[in-house]
Structures are given as structure tokens and as C-alpha cells.
UniProtKB/Swiss-Prot annotation:
Present in an inactive conformation in the absence of bound ligand. CSF1 or IL34 binding leads to dimerization and activation by autophosphorylation on tyrosine residues. Inhibited by imatinib/STI-571 (Gleevec), dasatinib, sunitinib/SU11248, lestaurtinib/CEP-701, midostaurin/PKC-412, Ki20227, linifanib/ABT-869, Axitinib/AG013736, sorafenib/BAY 43-9006 and GW2580. Changing G765D: In HDLS1; impairs autophosphorylation upon stimulation with CSF1. The chain crosses the membrane at residues 518-538. GO terms for cellular component: cell surface; CSF1-CSF1R complex; intracellular membrane-bounded organelle; nucleoplasm; plasma membrane; receptor complex. This is Macrophage colony-stimulating factor 1 receptor. Keywords: ATP-binding, Cell membrane, Disease variant, Disulfide bond, Glycoprotein, Immunity, Immunoglobulin domain, Inflammatory response, Innate immunity, Kinase, Membrane, Neurodegeneration, Nucleotide-binding, Phosphoprotein, Proto-oncogene, Receptor, Repeat, Signal, Transferase, Transmembrane, Transmembrane helix, Tyrosine-protein kinase, Ubl conjugation. Changing Y809F: Reduced kinase activity. Reduced interaction with SRC, FYN and YES1. The modification Phosphoserine is found at S713. Changing P693H: In a lung squamous cell carcinoma sample; somatic mutation. It catalyses: L-tyrosyl-[protein] + ATP = O-phospho-L-tyrosyl-[protein] + ADP + H(+). The keyword Transmembrane applies. Induction: Up-regulated by glucocorticoids.
Amino acid sequence: MGPGVLLLLLVATAWHGQGIPVIEPSVPELVVKPGATVTLRCVGNGSVEWDGPPSPHWTLYSDGSSSILSTNNATFQNTGTYRCTEPGDPLGGSAAIHLYVKDPARPWNVLAQEVVVFEDQDALLPCLLTDPVLEAGVSLVRVRGRPLMRHTNYSFSPWHGFTIHRAKFIQSQDYQCSALMGGRKVMSISIRLKVQKVIPGPPALTLVPAELVRIRGEAAQIVCSASSVDVNFDVFLQHNNTKLAIPQQSDFHNNRYQKVLTLNLDQVDFQHAGNYSCVASNVQGKHSTSMFFRVVESAYLNLSSEQNLIQEVTVGEGLNLKVMVEAYPGLQGFNWTYLGPFSDHQPEPKLANATTKDTYRHTFTLSLPRLKPSEAGRYSFLARNPGGWRALTFELTLRYPPEVSVIWTFINGSGTLLCAASGYPQPNVTWLQCSGHTDRCDEAQVLQVWDDPYPEVLSQEPFHKVTVQSLLTVETLEHNQTYECRAHNSVGSGSWAFIPISAGAHTHPPDEFLFTPVVVACMSIMALLLLLLLLLLYKYKQKPKYQVRWKIIESYEGNSYTFIDPTQLPYNEKWEFPRNNLQFGKTLGAGAFGKVVEATAFGLGKEDAVLKVAVKMLKSTAHADEKEALMSELKIMSHLGQHENIVNLLGACTHGGPVLVITEYCCYGDLLNFLRRKAEAMLGPSLSPGQDPEGGVDYKNIHLEKKYVRRDSGFSSQGVDTYVEMRPVSTSSNDSFSEQDLDKEDGRPLELRDLLHFSSQVAQGMAFLASKNCIHRDVAARNVLLTNGHVAKIGDFGLARDIMNDSNYIVKGNARLPVKWMAPESIFDCVYTVQSDVWSYGILLWEIFSLGLNPYPGILVNSKFYKLVKDGYQMAQPAFAPKNIYSIMQACWALEPTHRPTFQQICSFLQEQAQEDRRERDYTNLPSSSRSGGSGSSSSELEEESSSEHLTCCEQGDIAQPLLQPNNYQFC
């Protein structure tokens, strides 16, 4: 019967089961050796069909209701599951048998070398074992024995192979099936798995800008961008139904394929105008979006309003005047102006500037709430762009209900009642005569009515009330009767009752109590004095008290902190220094509570030492609690100890006079103004970073005409909108610090490494405070000083800062707080922790890498600001911050405090950044031609030379600094 084993399959002569085919041999699995003869017979009620793995070695015989599948030379490729079905059976019954061809040389039979599925479907890799004994040691690996990706969920079936459940796009790899045979791993051939993205619809499109206007000859750019989860899609840009040939740029971002078409027009002309459409399509369909490009001959500026330019409003009501502006180029300036006639004051409107349809149309709103009589008149909106000035004027007239008065007089010898009524619109007048004495004739019997359809107009000027006069001639006054003058217009009505008493008569307006002038005067004075007393009491309660911001933690449980009472800290007499050994100089800064004075200390540290120091002291009018607060600050500083990046305590005078706290003298002033001076030196006063679109700049304290107070102890220059100086600027030669002096303050241009240097040193100082369980509570660039060698030192200068006039400190309750630097939990829950200091440090980083901009530029501190903070709003990346530095800021601004990094982690990261910067030198400063010593000096030589000059600078403030050119600033 030939080599191998002959398996005789008996023909079933009877039908077994209802509607289910029968396979002989009737076993679920069959194991044979290579070269064996295998015969499989299937019998059913009708015709039957076989289904199984494809193989060239099978022979098929059909005989009515039976079908025979046979081979005389079985190979590993015959391994698989064979299923017999009866096509005509409505119940769909079937029978199956699994065949193993046990080939030691070929342990795996791979039925397909490529498998394609959609994402989140199960992917079956059909590698079948030829020997069931090997099932215990099977596994799935990537090619070359690499392990599977994490979170890969798979299972194995000896009849079907490996199944990767809910396959992901990232799992598109080449895989191999592995089995243990004789203690060694044997691999199948590779199977490529392709996991395709599920395409939800046509590609997403963006066309920028949504509308475009250009003057003939200007440059223009139109960007058409399409993205999809699958790379197989087309995109094109067409102009007025003409497809444009534009090079395509491709990218893969956020798990989406992106294709971008950019049309650049160097000089636009009228033929470039028209409709532009961005069209993209894939297997799911087509998507398109359009924009209109308008080319004009010259600049234009159009003003219009949907409102009537002549407005009438009842006094006390509100009005919003709206002007729609259509302009190109954009506005260079705009304002609302009051043109009279009542007063020369200008309105202080609440302006709402909202972009309506597109970039070139705006709506400006002048809000006039609760209109007063003096606010009637003409309001003009003026706007300017390169196309010229335009104005739109509204005329506002106020409507008033009539005011009425009546007097008795004689005209041409006849007794006459004279009624004067004023209001707008012009009032009509009616006379009534009624019986009895009453305030209104509605309450009595009306005897007679006279209408005056044409009262005499006494005055009628634009925007004023109209005053009319009506005369009623009365021959004889009936003393038991009332004469009433009524006036009415569209707004309301008014009346005055005239009641004859005797031979004369007196009048009184209805519902009005009569007081003697003496009683009224006394009551007015008493009310005024009471209000004045309440105001003084309120001001006293609102006045901020000097307190030390720094807090030292004694213990904590969760977010509940117990702080050490600084008054209970010991004071070591070793810090005591003789008052007579201090020679005071100029005042460095003065605030609401005290001042800081430059001084020379003789014998501090060493007997013959002469050292320049800064001395903190209170004002002579200080209260006892403020004296206690300064003493607490002294105790905290002595408790913390010394650190290079803290403004260190050098000594104190606590006996025989007011308390004096002696600290290090920092010659370069505070970090905030240092950065702002650098920004001005580099970019100029009108080109500093963050220029306001209306023509102003964010550095409102930087002007060429202004003088600067030298910030030796951390006090800023005078006249800053957002940062208030603690004393007026002196113009004397001793106290002023001119801009020429500032230009000479530092001989080396600013580089990225300097900003990293400042950031790292502040982080080290904060890490030191954190290690001492100290919370700063006011981490900001204004509270960081720079001393010799540009060493950054952290301090607290609340003593000498006028927080009443510093807009950085916002009133919350009875306190003034730097809310733009505060963490959400500090603002809303009054919780201060080391983690809240980390948030503030992130704001300080933003200040450093924006070169001294005010945080949250353009955002006022109001309810919207608090909502932004609560919702997790984060400022944009500063212009001079590398991406990884901005990542630190974002980590510091995590809403959950426990998710913020520690200061130690920040230190480590910044030190690594500094080392990387030294290696790569991506950001460099060009050597200044004005610098002595030649232009060929290396940066390290310049740095050493600059460092050697720091001490001279600190003592004399007199070294030359090259101008910072924009191209020296390589890290923006």
C-alpha cells in the first residue's frame, strides 16, 4: 500500500444526527507523520463541501452526498483544521477535524505571511503547530527575538494560532511564533501585521486665513492644510475653480497624517483676487472649505453703525453706542470723544472691542450706563490707519418727564396763575379747578378743565430740556378751591397744586414734607460727620500692616500646616553690632512701613574691615506690631542661616534705639529691572518684546526721558504702571541713576546661559528655604537681587515697598496680595505650601525668559482672571524661552500641587540645561566692536574680564557696557 500508514476510512451507511455532516475518522484531532497517506471522508444528507488550509497535496473526490479528501504524501503544509459543510442545510451544520503532520524539521505551518486588520479588531496570526506536544512552550515575539510591546494582549489556539486582541496602530510589526523543542527555541517564518486606522470620514481641513485683504504689490500667503488618521488621501488648492500646482509638505503629528500646501505671492495683483478653495478627499468622501482674497488699490477705512446716529434715551437709563469698523491695514489708533455741549470732560467708557466677521472688521462699543443730564450731547468715534482719519458722530438727547411750578402774579393788572413746565419732549399743559384743598384734583370734584394746546416756549436748545409757560387768568380766587397745573409728555407727567389760603396764597408741591432750614442744616452736618467717621474707620481697617511673608513650618498633616510663631524664636546676641560703627548714606528705597538705607559698616566680621551694607529700618511713626514684625524678620533670617542665593543677614542693632537689620548690599539691584534694562538696551524703548498693538509697549516704565533709581536693595524705578517704586525719583546727582549709568552697568551682553544662571540660582535658593521648612509666599523677580558676579539672591522687601500703590498687589479682603504670582490654592483657599512657592517660581521663570514682562499680559485681575486660573489657563511660551524651559513652567503650573516638581528636581534639570548649553552653544553673543582688547577675544575671555570688573561696578557704578544688538540675542 506504499510507504506510510494507510488509514482506511469506513463509509458511513446511516445518517448520524439531524442535518449535521459526519467526518470519518470520527476524532477531533489526527496526528500523522510526514509522507503518510491520509483520507478524510464527509457524508451528509445532500452535497457537502470541504474548507481548510490551502495545500497542493490534496485530491478531492465527490460522490453524491459524500466527499473524500485524500493525499498519499502528507507534509507539514497539510497541518490545519478541515471543516465539512452542507451548503443546502438551512441550519448551517458542520463538522471539523484538525490534522497534525508531525515534522520535527518544520514545527510551524504559517498559513499567511501578512495579516491586515483595522484598529481595535482582533488580529489572528495563523501559525499552526505541526506537533501538539509543543503547545506548552509556545510564545509570540517580534522579529529577531525582540519582546512584544507593553500592554500587548494575546492568546494562543493550537488549531488557529496567535490572536492579538484589540490591535493598535502602533502594533503594526513583523512577528514570529516561537516553540521550545529539545530545550531550544524554534521560530516560524515572519508574519507582517498591518493595523489600519479606522477612517471616520473625509480629512479635516484648515484654510488660513479665513479672509485676506492686500494692497496691490504687497506679499500674501495662503495655507491649505489637511489631516487624517490614514495617509491615503489627496489635497489640492484651487483658485476660481482652477487647480494650482503647489509643492506639498507632509508630516505626522498627534497620530494624524498632515499634508500642507502653501501659496506664497510676493507681489499680489488684481488677477490674484477671488475665491480660494482647499479640497481634500479619501475613501470616505470629499471635504472642502473656501476663503475670499480681496486685492485693493490703496488702504481703506470705513465706519458705519446699525444704529440711528440720532439717539433719544430717558435719563437714568443706559445706552451702548456701537460702531462697525472695516479697515486695511489695521487700526493705528482709535478713541471715543465727547464733543459737548455740557462739559469739557471726556467719557470714561467701558470699551468692548470684538472681532466680528473676520480680521478686517471690528465692532467698538461705548457703554454709557445710568445716563446723567450732563452726559447728553455729541459722541464721536475716531479711528486712524494708513488710509487716514475717519469719524462717526452720534447725537444723544435725553428724555425727561416734566417738572412743574406755579406762581401767582399780576399781569396787566389782572390776577394770573403762571405755570412753568420743563422736560423733553416738549410737554403739553392742562389746568384743572377742583373743590376743596387737595394735592391732586383726582381726589376731589373737578369743577373746570382748561387745555393749553400752544403754551409759550421759553427755551429750546439742542440736548436741553424744553421749557414752556402757560397763563391762567383768574379774576377772583375761590379760597376753598384748588388750581392744578398738569404737564405731560411721552416720558411721564408732573403737576403743581395752587391752594389759596387767604387774601394771599401759598403753594406746595405734592407729597413734600416741610423742614425748617436750621433742622435741615443740622441733620446734614451730622450725617456728613458720621460718614466721615465711618470712612476714616474703614481706611484704618483697610490699611495693610507690615508682616513678614516668610513662614517656617513646624508640622503639617495633609494641607493643614502649623507655622512657628517667629516672635518665639530665639535671638542670638552674636548678631549685635554697634550703632556707632554704621555710617549711613543715601536712602535706597522707602515704603509704607519703613526704608532701606545704604551704609558703610566698620569692623563687621573683621576688626579693620570696611563693608558696604544695606540697613532695614522702620519709620519713626511705626506701630508696636510693625516693630514686632521687623524683629520677627530678624529672627527668621538668623534661624535660617547663610546661603549663597539668599540675601544674608550680616548683623543687627536691637539695643539703644530703633531696630536695624543689616543685610548684604546688592549692587545690581533687582532682577526685574535688570532684565528690563537689558531688553531696552537690546531692542530700544519702542521695540521691546511684547509691543502693544495699539502702539504702546508693555514696558511702560521704560522711556528715554526717565531717570532710574539705582536698585541696590531691590527697589524698582519710579513711574511704572505695573511695578510701583517705593520712593520718588530724585533728580540730584547723588541719588539719580541715569540711563547712561545703566548702559555701563554690565560689560557683557545677555545670553541664554545668563537666564539659565539666574533661574538655577533662584531654584537653589528656594531649595535651601524648602530644606529649612520655610515658605516664601512672594516669589517674584522683584524680590530677587543681583550682586557681584551676577549672583542671584532671594529676599523679601515688603518693608520698603509701597504696596498701597503697587498694582502687582491686589486687594483681597483686608490684605493686598500678589495674585498674579499666587497658586490657585493660595488665591481661593488661603493655603500656602512649598508647592505654592513652586507655582510662583514658574511665574518668575516666565518673567526671566520674557525679559521682565508683567505676567498674564493684557489680562486684568477680575472675575475672568480668577476663572482662567481656576480652569487651568497657562501663559504662552515666552519669546526667549527654549521649549524645555517652558515645559518646566508648565509643570510648575499644574493645578494639583502634588503634581508639581520639587525645587531639588528643578535645580537638577536646570544644571543639566546649563551644561548642555555650554556644550552646544546654540545661542551666542557676537563680540562688541566697542569693547577694548580687540574683537578677537573669545567668549570665555570676555566672561572672565566681565567677572573681574563686577566689584568695580558695584562700588563705582561706572563701567562701560556695549550696546545690545538684536542679532546678539540668538536665543529668541
